[in-house]
Design a protein with these regions (language model features):
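A cross-family phosphate/adenosyl-ligand binding-site feature
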Residues: 1-96, 134-178
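Arginine/glycine-rich "motif VI" loop of SF2 helicases in the C-terminal RecA-like domain
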Residues: 53, 120-127, 153-154
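Active-site/ligand-binding-proximal alpha/beta "capping" segment
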Residues: 90-122, 130
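Short loop-to-beta-strand entry elements in the cores of soluble alpha/beta enzymes
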Residues: 127-135
């Protein structure tokens, strides 16, 4: 299974985040899955890729040209796909993925997973869309989605493919059913 993971190029301030990233990367690699991610060697992105590689996995990085020019790419990847810009990167990462996971991240992570959430809710993408709600990070987003339903702006049916999870065990349960 190709698992696209969205997460930041920063490390964040919560040590539990780095531990969870390592755990997921190792699980992907050890279980014969293929990681698709943003291609950077920095922060959580680099940690995820290296964990998957160290566990024997294969990894595709998808990185826009302007990051290549800044020499931010991970040099040990199985494959590096260079895109013109962020929009093309986002499209390519969706094309390559069979399942999608968003770790806590910044505005880029939010933008990327929002595109997946939209496609899933519109029926244009039939794949797990998982938000890793580590230590309640995505609680406010979950509340917003619930508010959309409450106000008649969305439906439970449209949001049924969007899943919030608290740990790797919940992720693996979802992916094993996909």
């Amino acid at each position: 299974m190709n698992i696209t993971v969205y997460l930041g190029a920063n490390e964040g301030s919560d040590p539990a985040l780095a531990a969870a990233v390592r755990e997921l990367g190792s699980w992907i690699g050890a279980n014969g899955h293929h990681l698709v991610y943003g291609g950077s060697r920095s922060g959580l992105m680099g940690l995820l890729a290296q964990s998957a590689l160290d566990a024997g996995g294969t990894v595709t990085g998808v990185e826009p040209q302007f990051f290549i020019q800044q020499e931010l790419q991970h040099d040990g990847l199985t494959e590096l796909i260079v895109t013109r810009d962020m929009a093309e990167r986002k499209t390519k990462m969706i094309e390559l993925g069979d399942a999608f996971i968003a770790f806590p991240g910044g505005t880029g992570t939010l933008e990327e997973i929002a595109e997946v959430m939209s496609r899933v809710s519109l029926g244009q993408l039939d794949a797990p869309c998982i938000l890793y709600d580590l230590n309640g990070y995505y609680d406010s987003l979950k509340a917003l989605l619930d508010k959309m339903i409450e106000k008649g702006l969305s439906t439970p049916q449209r949001q049924r493919g969007i899943r919030f999870v608290a740990n790797l065990e919940e992720i693996t349960t979802i992916l094993n059913k996909a």
